[in-house]
Amino acid sequence: MPFITAASHRLEYALLNPHHTAAPWLVFLHEGLGSVAMWKDFPLKLCAATGCRGLVYSRHGYGKSDPLTAPRRADFMHDEARHALPELLDQLHIANPVLFGHSDGASIALLHAGLTSRPVAALVAMAPHVMVEDISIASIEAASVAWETTDLRERLRPYHDDPDSAFRGWNDIWLHPDFRSWNIEDCLPGIRCPVLAIQGVDDEYGTIDQIDRIARGAVNAEVELLKLADCRHSPHKDQPEAVIAAVQRFIARLP
């Protein structure tokens, strides 16, 4: 696995189908406990279905990337969107990508498209967070209990060199009192690319109000919503065929 330095941190990454030089780039931004390995073969399948090239990477604190050396701040997703992601894309010469974000990664994608002047061809936000809900806190508190009482650390070890860094970096900031008022709806009017927002109706980390707010708030973008039945917080695992088909149609309509 190659590494690259962005925002002063060593990050692991993988390029998919890089020889397809005329194809658009799909940039995958993982969830709050995700990594390159955690995606498994989904990025390859989606790139094959859409004819895209792909970039998959682990953010600081995850996978084989540098572990955290300090607690995350409440604005950590803003920092990722404004600094780490642009530096990474510039170094890899990736311009005008289609961003595919899951959970925290979807929030970072929304922030990047809404707050920076960088061109984004389109954005897929899967199980995104635009504000903190009671259901989010309850599920993250339950994860904290599982961390202390089950083998969750060992189950995360195949996906993270430092599972403590990955878990604590995610869990501690989401449960911090300063994070309860976190809200990124103010970035939504700045999004000017097509958006596909996907959420499972049984998502244990957020209600359908999350993507409904994107539809209301992204007033300068064309927003398509996909609400999936029998689907929880990871639609690409619970309903992979539906997700791939929807993204394939979405990308095929792009100019």
How should these model regions be labeled?
Residues 12, 16-67:
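Conserved HGGG/HGGXW glycine-rich cap/lid loop of the alpha/beta-hydrolase fold
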Residues 50, 56-96:
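Active-site loop/oxyanion-hole signature of alpha/beta-hydrolase fold enzymes
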Residues 95-133:
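Conserved hydrolase catalytic core segment
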Residues 191, 197-199:
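Short beta-strand/loop motif that positions the catalytic acidic residue
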Residues 216-233:
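Catalytic histidine neighborhood in serine/cysteine hydrolases
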